[in-house]
């Protein structure tokens, strides 16, 4: 591959589910234009402009005997559809998946209505043109529609039909947290393929955090503390907001830090899991 590699690691993979029944061991090399799966006696090239779906999940039943987790890449090449499966565990693969999505949708033109709703109220905000940019945990829209969606705070998303600049379009409606509470942003892309990929990326972030959050038990007092930190920032007077003394606040914060919902490295701040918890519970709290 002549272009520079942005990912290069060794893994087990099934180069093509139509022709291989068992995984092989080899290198996974990615550039800005393609992914190459290279084993001892063969090489499979996946053109990124042909990729129409990417999934990162627990291995389905027929692959569970080979893999615990998988990255499945579906793509078109020479007018045929193919599916490649890569072993999906570990931080290296997590970074690889993010790089794949960045290569697929980064810089794509988007029309965004932000916010389309504040809480349950529809706004009169117009659709504005921008470009997509992905960074760890964030979806940023640059240009006229200048905004950033913290993906850890997404509580719901769906495809809906809306009129955009005089024509009916299918778009993504994303409910997430804004600076003052829940808002909804609507995103329209001209490419159905890229719309599907963006939706898949949002779902991936959403699902992984929800799975982590399902293992965390929170008391009503802990939820109130998380919402107070979100609403007031590192200078929040939790003792005053919660009506408890300083020693109780210290105990609460220690519990939240242990549950990886809060960090105190540079002042009190929510982790991505903590922000997801706020998004899940904020409407249950009246501060």
UniProtKB/Swiss-Prot annotation:
InterPro entries: CheF1/F2, WH-like_DNA-bd_sf, WH_DNA-bd_sf. It holds the Pfam family CheF-arch. Keywords: Chemotaxis. GO terms for biological process: chemotaxis. The keyword Transferase does not apply. Disruption phenotype: Deletion has only minimal effects. It comes from the Archaea. PANTHER family: TAXIS PROTEIN. Involved in taxis signal transduction. Interacts with chemotaxis (Che) proteins as well as flagella accessory (Fla) proteins. This is Taxis protein CheF2. It comes from Halobacterium salinarum (strain ATCC 29341 / DSM 671 / R1). The gene is cheF2.
């Amino acid at each position: 591959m002549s272009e520079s590699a942005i990912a290069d690691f060794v893994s087990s993979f099934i180069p093509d589910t139509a022709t291989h029944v068992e995984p092989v061991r080899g290198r996974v090399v990615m550039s800005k234009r393609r992914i190459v799966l290279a084993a001892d006696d063969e090489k499979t090239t996946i053109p990124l402009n042909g990729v129409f779906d990417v999934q990162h999940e627990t291995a389905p039943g027929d692959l569970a005997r080979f893999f615990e987790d998988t990255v499945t890449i579906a793509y078109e090449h020479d007018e045929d559809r193919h599916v490649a499966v890569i072993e999906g565990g570990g931080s290296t693969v997590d970074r690889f998946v993010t790089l794949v999505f960045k290569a697929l949708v980064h810089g794509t033109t988007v029309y965004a209505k932000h916010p389309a709703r504040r809480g349950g109220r529809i706004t009169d905000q117009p659709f504005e043109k921008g470009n997509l940019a992905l960074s760890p945990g964030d979806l940023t829209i640059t240009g006229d529609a200048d905004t950033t969606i913290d993906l850890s705070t997404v509580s719901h998303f769906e495809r809906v039909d809306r009129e955009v600049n005089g024509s009916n379009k299918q778009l993504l409606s994303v409910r997430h947290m804004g600076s003052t509470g829940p808002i909804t942003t609507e995103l329209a892309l001209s490419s159905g393929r890229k719309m599907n990929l963006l939706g898949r990326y949002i779902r991936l972030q959403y699902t992984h955090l929800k799975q982590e959050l399902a293992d965390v038990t929170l008391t009503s007092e802990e939820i109130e503390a998380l919402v107070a930190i979100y609403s007031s920032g590192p200078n929040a007077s939790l003792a005053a907001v919660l009506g408890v003394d300083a020693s109780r606040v210290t105990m609460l914060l220690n519990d939240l830090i242990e549950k990886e919902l809060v960090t105190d490295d540079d002042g009190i701040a929510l982790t991505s899991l903590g922000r997801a918890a706020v998004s899940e519970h904020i409407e249950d709290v009246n501060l």
